[in-house]
């Protein structure tokens, strides 16, 4: 089975993929992938462009590296489509917590003032303690 990986993945994941018998794996990215690689791949891991997907004659399975799959689901080619839904839950949660704390503590404003070498108190800062966030 010809597998095309269009994402940078950790070595441990490469080793797991390569342990599957009968796989011929190519690692590249969607900016450097060749027409021949796209045409011959039965499995693609990553998010090819729609134009690239149009040329994937042998494609049986597309594993997206993103959660959003609407554009790919609407593609007329028939293939199994899976996404990375749930893979980013912790990262998104941490990002939202960071955004909330940045807003409550005036971090962007203080960072700007600090870069200007201005030491000004911006007043009351809120806390997330006892809050519904």
Locations of regions flagged by a protein language model:
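Phosphate/diphosphate ligand-binding glycine-rich loop within oxidoreductases
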Residues: 42-115
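N-terminal glycine-/charge-rich "phosphate-binding" loop or analogous flexible N-terminal tail
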Residues: 1-41
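Structural alpha-helical scaffold elements that stabilize or flank donor/cofactor-binding regions
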Residues: 36-37, 52-55, 127
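A structural micro-motif
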Residues: 1, 23, 59-60, 79, ...
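Amphipathic coiled-coil/heptad-repeat helices and related helical stalk/stem segments
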Residues: 30, 46-49, 119-120
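Glycine-rich NAD(P)-binding loop of Rossmann-like domains
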Residues: 111-133
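Short secondary-structure boundary/capping segments
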Residues: 17, 35, 71-73, 124-126
């Amino acid at each position: 089975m010809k597998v095309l990986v269009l994402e940078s993945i950790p070595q441990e994941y490469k080793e797991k993929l390569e342990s599957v018998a009968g796989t011929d794996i190519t690692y590249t990215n969607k900016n450097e992938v060749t027409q021949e690689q796209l045409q011959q791949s039965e499995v693609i891991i990553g998010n090819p462009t729609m134009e690239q997907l149009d040329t994937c004659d042998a494609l049986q399975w597309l594993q997206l590296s993103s959660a959003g799959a609407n554009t790919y689901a609407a593609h007329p080619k028939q293939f199994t489509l899976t996404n990375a839904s749930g893979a980013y839950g912790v990262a998104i949660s941490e990002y939202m917590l960071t955004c909330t704390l940045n807003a409550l503590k005036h971090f962007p404003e203080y960072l700007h003032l600090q870069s200007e070498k201005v030491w000004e108190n911006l007043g009351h800062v809120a806390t997330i303690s006892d809050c519904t966030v």
